[in-house]
């Protein structure tokens, strides 16, 4: 991130930078979406087949309307992918990333049946925390801001008015006492560190104050004072300490997203005490003396910490008091940081919307138990994610994107969707065949051999783990190079299997759920769906369409459904695929397009050889201390590789490395 981007610029325009022009049916999709936005329609659905360039279409919409934009994805990996794609297309604008800032998070919980209290355990990721702060700051200072977020965007943040009131603008010639500046820095979450330039820290030597902001990498500000007046402001590189620029003004934002307002701290603590007195009376009247004692002890300890330091462990549980919200009032969230005219894009809406719906009830159920048994005050219930109705009340105009939109979003638009099913590569939706289950395994083996002759690969999806294990073992007995992809595999192992499938180390991968990200491999030309006619999540219409789409990147893409009857879901999926395929064929014929398999480079390995050796070494070490040191060394190596992958815009590898780091951190914590 360039240092200039931390400066206040009120109303920049988006500039889409790309060597591509809209092709296929992207133009008509862009026109229809644009028209609906101009007409102020709240809901739109972009039904985009796999590989048709939905992100590119959305980028054109954002650029045309110059509105702040929120893009919500259902997990960190997809959010990271979208972030890097949009960042590449909008290099001169603010593209931000907002996900959970924890590498590891175990929420506070109590299990009454076992009388087991589980304390909150977490490991914060400073890099992600920095990116969250950057997103908040950008939304409050820049019109040309795109934030790519997970559902973390729906969890509680500080009131944006309170947060922005903590901004301080420093100018050359401004009168300010050194102690006033240092006091503001401490109250805004900065920590003093005269030795190391850490994110969210400051140093003070004589009349020179150096501030390392918490929202941008490798940059710090040197404020030189003379006789209670700012004499000069310089931007410096935090690593080399070299001067980057001499500036006249800078806006410094808080180092944390939750800042306790000092002038209101006394009132906040009194309000917490009043609630405590009321709740203790309730518990004592119900003869819950143990719960009352527990609550009093815990809350008073938190109050002492709040009054002394302006902070306490689990401060988020007092967020309604910090924000002066009434009981039941919704929390402030990232959406409150947007201006009054922003656009929302819900990616993979058939997955993301159900996830948003479920968050509130899951969170409330856990916290009700904590309140009932005296671990938390009732106001802790108001530290929560938005419920679905609240989310809907905050979004202005929204585009739902999916290859298989859900019934909810389809009903919102009366099934009048904007279609985008022509691929720039000319690739057609896969052919589909239905075959009887009699001798199905022999038939699959024959298909595997045919694909192997063409140097192509095969996916096989079953309904149960047992079926996958048995089928994998049987194929191995037949000397077929096969791997089993299951949920217990660690991120790195899963990625290495898929990489080896592409290389030809394996010819087949067997699994239960082949709907996860990272499975769109151009070498895979056949997907075999066992028990295709059975009812359930993995064999409903949307899952079948998504599974068929696993082979849509190969010109010979084909799906074989093994079933003795044709279920309604099968019938709908086949009809929809054939409908799309017909449109695609007609378009190719009209424009003389010859479909071709997507070309995608195969990386030699996700990990460097050095990191592989260190990881293998760690597994063999029995001494606990030495093992922890080796794991930490591996984590440090992986962080370097992850940052390098991010710089090279290899977001798939960067995401895999990040997940591997999280797994190793968890392993280190349990040793």
From Swiss-Prot:
The keyword tRNA-binding does not apply. Its main location: cytoplasm. Disulfide bonds: none annotated. Belongs to the UvrB family. Residues 632-667 form the UVR domain. The beta-hairpin motif is involved in DNA binding. It comes from Mycoplasma mycoides subsp. mycoides SC (strain CCUG 32753 / NCTC 10114 / PG1). GO terms for cellular component: cytoplasm; excinuclease repair complex. The UvrABC repair system catalyzes the recognition and processing of DNA lesions. A damage recognition complex composed of 2 UvrA and 2 UvrB subunits scans DNA for abnormalities. Upon binding of the UvrA(2)B(2) complex to a putative damaged site, the DNA wraps around one UvrB monomer. DNA wrap is dependent on ATP binding by UvrB and probably causes local melting of the DNA helix, facilitating insertion of UvrB beta-hairpin between the DNA strands. Then UvrB probes one DNA strand for the presence of a lesion. This is UvrABC system protein B. Residues 440-602 form the Helicase C-terminal domain. ATP binds at residues 48-55.
């Amino acid at each position: 991130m360039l240092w200039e981007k931390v400066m206040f610029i009120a109303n920049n325009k988006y500039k889409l930078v790309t060597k591509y022009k809209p092709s296929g049916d992207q133009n008509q999709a862009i026109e229809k979406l644009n028209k609906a936005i101009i007409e102020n329609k709240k809901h739109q659905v972009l039904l985009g087949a796999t590989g048709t360039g939905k992100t590119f279409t959305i980028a054109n919409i954002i650029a045309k309307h110059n509105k702040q934009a929120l893009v919500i994805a259902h997990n960190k990996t997809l959010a990271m992918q979208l972030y890097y794609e949009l960042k590449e297309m909008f290099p001169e604008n603010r593209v931000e990333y907002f996900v959970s800032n924890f590498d590891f998070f175990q929420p506070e919980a109590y299990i009454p049946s076992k009388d087991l209290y589980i304390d909150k355990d977490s490991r914060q990721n400073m890099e992600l925390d920095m990116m969250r702060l950057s997103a908040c700051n950008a939304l409050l200072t820049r019109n040309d801001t795109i934030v790519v977020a997970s559902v973390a965007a729906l969890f509680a943040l500080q009131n944006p008015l309170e947060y922005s009131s903590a901004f301080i603008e420093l100018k050359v010639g401004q009168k300010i006492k050194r102690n006033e500046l240092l006091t503001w820095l401490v109250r805004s979450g900065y920590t003093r560190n005269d030795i190391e330039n850490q994110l969210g820290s400051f140093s003070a030597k004589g009349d020179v104050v150096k501030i390392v902001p918490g929202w941008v990498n490798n940059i710090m500000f040197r404020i030189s004072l003379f006789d209670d007046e700012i004499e000069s402001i310089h931007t410096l590189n935090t690593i080399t300490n070299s001067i980057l620029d001499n500036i006249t003004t800078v806006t410094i934002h808080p180092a944390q997203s939750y800042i306790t307002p000092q002038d209101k701290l006394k009132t906040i603590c009194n309000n917490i005490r009043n609630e405590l007195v009321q709740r203790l009376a309730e518990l004592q009247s119900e003869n819950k003396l143990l719960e009352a004692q527990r609550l009093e002890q815990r809350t008073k300890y938190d109050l002492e910490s709040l009054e002394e330091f302006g902070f306490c462990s689990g401060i988020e549980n007092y967020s309604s008091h910090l924000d002066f919200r009434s009981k039941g009032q919704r929390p402030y969230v990232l959406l409150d940081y947007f201006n009054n005219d922003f656009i929302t894009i819900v990616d993979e809406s058939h997955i993301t919307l159900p996830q948003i719906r479920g968050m509130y009830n899951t969170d409330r159920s856990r916290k009700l138990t904590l309140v009932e048994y005296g671990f938390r005050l009732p106001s802790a219930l108001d530290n929560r994610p938005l419920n679905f109705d609240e989310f809907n009340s905050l979004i202005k105009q929204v585009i739902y994107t999916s290859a298989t939109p859900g019934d909810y979003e389809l009903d919102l638009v009366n099934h009048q969707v904007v279609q985008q099913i022509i691929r720039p590569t000319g690739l057609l939706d896969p052919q589909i065949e239905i075959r009887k289950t009699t001798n199905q395994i022999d038939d699959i083996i024959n298909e595997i051999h045919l694909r192997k002759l063409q140097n192509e690969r095969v996916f096989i999806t079953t309904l149960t783990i047992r079926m996958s294990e048995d089928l994998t073992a049987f194929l191995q007995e037949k000397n077929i190079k096969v791997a089993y992809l299951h949920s217990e595999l660690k991120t790195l192992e899963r990625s290495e299997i898929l990489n080896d499938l592409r290389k030809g180390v394996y010819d087949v991968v067997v699994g239960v759920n082949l709907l996860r990200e990272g499975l769109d491999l151009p070498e895979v030309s056949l997907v075999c769906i066992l028990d295709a006619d059975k009812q359930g999540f993995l064999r409903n219409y949307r899952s079948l369409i998504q599974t068929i789409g696993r082979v849509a990147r190969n010109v010979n893409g084909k799906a074989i459904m093994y079933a003795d009857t044709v279920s309604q879901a099968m019938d709908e999926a086949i009809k929809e695929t054939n409908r799309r395929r017909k449109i695609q064929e007609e378009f190719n014929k009209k424009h003389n397009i010859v479909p071709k398999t997507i070309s995608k480079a195969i990386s030699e390995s996700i990990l460097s050889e050095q990191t592989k050796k260190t990881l293998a070494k760690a597994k063999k070490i029995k001494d606990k201390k030495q093992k922890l040191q080796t794991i930490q060394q591996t984590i440090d190596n992986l962080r370097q590789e992850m940052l390098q992958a991010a710089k090279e815009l290899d977001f798939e590898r960067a995401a895999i490395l990040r997940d591997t780091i999280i797994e190793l951190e968890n392993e280190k914590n349990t040793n």
